[in-house]
């Protein structure tokens, strides 16, 4: 072989090896651990059951079902995935692809808002709108503000004027267009306030003097000396309640006063409680109110009526569980029932809710446990006690965590730095920066010796040790050796991805010297 050719091949191979020496090898298995294929990518991201991203060097690709590059995503990293939109970041900004592969916005924007059939992009105070139905991008101009509402309307503001560029009357201006968590936009014109549906049409004409959103599709207003409770509707909004008596809406509490006296607790579309003698109402939770009366009684009111009947000798009643409600008297807490009777006298500085017939209580600084009869189960010697589930509670003492049973006995003699409960009753534990796993009876199934541990499902635990990743089951048996950089699992498609570094094989082509026959001696 020619010597110059040999040198040229060696140079090319050396260059190729130096360029690819950082490549990553991925092996794809099914969930029965049968090898399906091998892939060469630096990174693989599973964004959804059907959207997979591969990165090789500076090239980012949307992958096909067989994990081959199908569409180049142009950018260098995935900025965000908001189904069905893939936002991609590049040197000059953010752009967008549809998950089917179509690039719809170049990578040059600062911000992109998404909706299932449109995108709103901006650079500084300039805005562009992409509409998938028309497959086009429209320049909206220089604006002070623009947004997509949760119903898909576009609201823009320029100075003090608002408009809806996608409505049937895009040039119409408003004094206010306000989005909320309901399905209707609150609009204001010189004639008053109204409500606009997702098509951009009025379902409540703009004639209301004042109007504000309360919850969902409900609104509180005032017009022509009447207080109004209004429910939005796609065709025509309905006035659910109206009154010439004063209705206030402050701190998420709606009250009606008759002749200056508190008479009714209101809900979004009508009367929740009509009673005489009320002096004040305080909100203590979602749709929960403490109602105070002139005769010094206090009751707990819920969405469907009294949760705790008004009772004496109580200052506050909290939401409860298992038929018992934490309540305070003279600064101490105990428990009352729904009839307004003390079941456990007020004697604690603080209590938790009952769970599986047990609750935690605090005296001064430390916590203990009582049962639903008020009997002490565990002394107040704990810094923290979490609710009982399946007969066990997580408790903290001297900065360490323990598992506590319903007899007040700890199941682990040596404390952990932290304990996390899994959804099916197992416990992830940490000690000295290492993780392990306990079963539902607090028995060790995986020793506390891993830097990371994630229980994907029963008998499939992804672990990290010494910078490498593997999979073990709950008996400690190795399923996938702890020898990989990363492991990804796609249960929906029956795939397991393992990542490993590799160094390409160096191929040397050496020209052997020509052999000459020697003459015999």
Predicted regions span which residues?
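Bacterial Sec-dependent N-terminal signal peptides
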Residues: 1-25
